[in-house]
From Swiss-Prot:
InterPro entries: AICAR_Tfase_dup_dom_sf, Cytidine_deaminase-like, MGS-like_dom, MGS-like_dom_sf, PurH-like. GO terms for cellular component: cytosol. This is Bifunctional purine biosynthesis protein PurH. Its EC number is 2.1.2.3, 3.5.4.10. It catalyses: (6R)-10-formyltetrahydrofolate + 5-amino-1-(5-phospho-beta-D-ribosyl)imidazole-4-carboxamide = 5-formamido-1-(5-phospho-D-ribosyl)imidazole-4-carboxamide + (6S)-5,6,7,8-tetrahydrofolate; IMP + H2O = 5-formamido-1-(5-phospho-D-ribosyl)imidazole-4-carboxamide. Coiled coil: none annotated. It comes from Brucella abortus (strain 2308). The IMP cyclohydrolase activity resides in the N-terminal region.
Length: 538
């Protein structure tokens, strides 16, 4: 049953006479405590926070002095006491609450400055189970929630970035804080505890291999506010979850304008794709537009891989994202800057390459320090009206699959290498996806069509256009291989690929008409490999 309210109006300005400071992150703590003391605020504190404040010569009272109870159980129990929570939760102009405070000797607390044990940091650094559990804060969230609920009389500060604003408001209002400001702090406080609990619940689900927990929480911390979202009439913000997976969220931006919503989405897609290629084996480049690849290639150098990728669809590459699986060097940088590019993302960049890119001041250059592991577990989520779709990350890798040759002719070694390449790329193309590959480079990509045969035709037409632009008589698809992200429901998609010049095919299989498709391949002397794994992408 819901708890009813007494409807006691909150004061607009509430005087801050007493503050409780208990922080794990001590950034800015001493200057803030000095400012509170200068504004006549009595400071209560706990453990290490109290020691730091006292060491700076600022008067401070340990919370055990008001509870009459020492910290026990390795600090697990120190603020879970009525003298603390009564001071945070009391409604100051409710006679019953005031009487209870007087009867039990509870003093009001007007400002709660709390930040939490670094659970998220320990979690993502790979702390062992017991260490991670020990970093689950109990008293901190309890105090934050208590003070934020009672924002009519208590201001709650959970972020050192807000210290300056608190001091400014205190000085502006002669030692008081306005209700609107207290509400703003309370909203932030509840979002902080929600994010903290989300991190804990998600970690526990992973720890016990619970893939579909009864409750699923998602949370992140605001990193930046976008100028707009996918379109100018949409608002947007970029939130970080704390996951250390190398990519756009963890990258260092060395130069260029602020990343837009679409930049971030496309850059993530590009870097996840290029990470499919082991840098110890080959250099690889992916060029992305609207989260779909325009061209992907591998070679002995990044420069060569870039030029091969660009040749696939140089028109669409204009204004695209370029992702590398190796360090950006001077030779590659000189080629990339010849075409208008929004973002370059790479594990690293040489000083010479950075100097070349610097000539294009708006070009964003990101370095990540590494590549994401395509085999790593993770989750992918999508919102729908009234719900959240959550699934495991598509971490299937073609090198790990049991490939089956289903035609009379087996692919040659060169064809098989290109087939695997094409299937890696197809995993990152919006469905229905058809990818033509020759000599370690895409030569035609068909994406996002409602019918597979249309994707095959579009990819072939793009290959013809690219050949014409390069002054070649034959289409780039002549003698190529083709990958499909899902099975061919009919032979028509395969026949379109054959017509384009493909000599070998890789696809998941699983259609009720597989025999018909295989027969068509045999009739045309095509080698076909089935993977048993589909890569739909929507």
């Amino acid at each position: 049953m819901a708890v009813s309210s007494k409807h006691i109006p909150a004061p607009d300005l509430h005087r801050v006479r007493r503050a409780l400071l208990s922080v794990s992150d001590k950034t800015g703590l001493i200057d803030f405590a000095k400012a509170l003391h200068a504004n006549g605020v009595e400071i209560l504190s706990t453990g290490g926070t109290a020691k730091s404040i006292a060491a700076a010569g600022i008067p401070v009272k340990d919370v055990s002095e008001i509870t009459g109870f020492p910290e026990i159980m390795d600090g697990r129990v120190k603020t879970l006491h009525p003298a603390v929570h009564g001071g945070l939760l009391a409604v100051r102009n409710d006679p019953e609450h005031v009487a209870a405070m007087e009867e039990h000797g509870i003093g009001g607390i007007d400002l709660a400055v709390i930040n939490l044990y670094p659970f998220e940091e320990v979690r993502f650094k790979g702390g062992d189970y017991d260490t991670t559990v020990e970093n689950i804060d109990i008293g901190g969230p309890a105090m934050i929630r208590a003070s934020a609920k009672n924002h009519a009389y208590v201001a709650t500060v959970v972020d050192p970035a807000d210290y300056a604003d608190v001091v400014a408001e205190l000085e502006k209002h002669s030692g008081s804080l306005p209700l609107a400001f207290r509400k703003k702090l309370a909203a932030k406080a509840f979002s902080r505890t929600a994010a903290y609990d989300a991190a804990i619940s998600n970690w526990f689900a992973e720890a016990i291999d619970e893939e579909t927990p009864t409750y699923r929480a998602a949370a992140g911390k605001l990193h930046s506010v976008m100028r707009y979202g996918e379109n100018p009439h949409q608002t947007a913000g970029f939130y970080l979850t704390g996951e250390k997976r190398p990519g756009v969220a963890t990258a260092t931006q060395l130069q260029g304008k602020q990343l837009s919503y679409n930049n971030i989405n496309d850059t993530d897609a590009a870097f996840e794709l290029v990470a499919e290629f082991d840098p110890a084996r080959t250099a690889a480049v992916a060029i992305i537009k609207h989260a779909n690849p325009c061209g992907v290639a591998e070679a002995s150098t990044i420069k060569e891989a870039y030029l091969k990728a660009l040749a696939c669809d140089p028109v669409s590459a204009f204004g695209g994202i370029v992702a590398l699986n190796r360090t950006l060097d001077e030779e590659a940088a000189e080629e990339i800057v010849k075409t208008f590019t929004e973002v370059i993302i790479a594990p690293d960049a040489t000083e010479g390459a950075q100097a070349i890119v610097a000539a294009k001041k708006n070009l964003r250059l990101l370095v990540t320090g590494g590549l994401p592991d395509p085999r790593a577990k993770g989750i992918a989520a999508k919102t729908v009206a009234g719900g959240l779709l959550v699934q495991s990350r598509d971490n299937g890798v073609v090198d790990d699959l049991d490939l089956k040759v289903v035609t009379k002719r087996a692919p040659t070694e060169a064809e098989l290498n290109d087939l695997k390449f094409a299937f890696r790329v197809g995993k990152h193309v919006k469905s229905n996806a058809i990818v033509y590959v020759k000599d370690g480079a895409t030569v035609g990509i068909g994406a996002g069509q409602m019918s597979r045969v249309d994707s095959a035709r579009i990819a072939a037409r793009k290959a013809e256009d690219a050949a014409e632009a390069a002054g070649l008589a034959a289409p780039l698809t002549k003698g190529c291989v083709v990958a499909s992200d899902a099975f061919f429901p009919f032979a028509d998609g395969l026949l379109s690929a054959v017509e384009a010049g493909a000599t070998a095919v890789i696809q998941p299989g699983g259609s009720m008409r597989d025999d018909e498709v295989i027969a068509a391949a045999d009739e045309h002397g095509i080698a076909m490999v089935m993977t048993g794994m589909r890569h739909f992408r929507h």
